[in-house]
Amino acid sequence: MARYFRRRKFCRFTTEGVVEIDYKDIATLKNYITESGKIVPSRITGTRAKYQRQLARAIKRARYLSLLPYTDRHQ
């Protein structure tokens, strides 16, 4: 069986020098939620703990203000 090369995880916010994650930046936040609307864990994205907490807080604020949906579809 062949072993696949795993891409190295890195924190995008650290490399870009982001001070604080903004809840109004919907394009960035959408990269960190699944199709069903769940927040993607840091062990998958590689985000540092400090930024993962800010990310979760920003996503929850955006959901509360109806900028992001809580789920994908209500049926």
From Swiss-Prot:
Q: Which Pfam families match?
A: Ribosomal_S18 (PF01084)
Task: Give GO MF terms, alphabetically.
Answer: small ribosomal subunit rRNA binding; structural constituent of ribosome
List the GO cellular component terms.
Answer: cytosolic small ribosomal subunit
Quote the InterPro entries the UniProt record gives.
Answer: Ribosomal_bS18, Ribosomal_bS18_CS, Ribosomal_bS18_sf
Record field: transmembrane: none
Outline the subunit composition: Part of the 30S ribosomal subunit. Forms a tight heterodimer with protein bS6.
What is the protein's name according to its record? Answer: Small ribosomal subunit protein bS18
Gene source species: Sodalis glossinidius (strain morsitans)
The encoding gene = rpsR
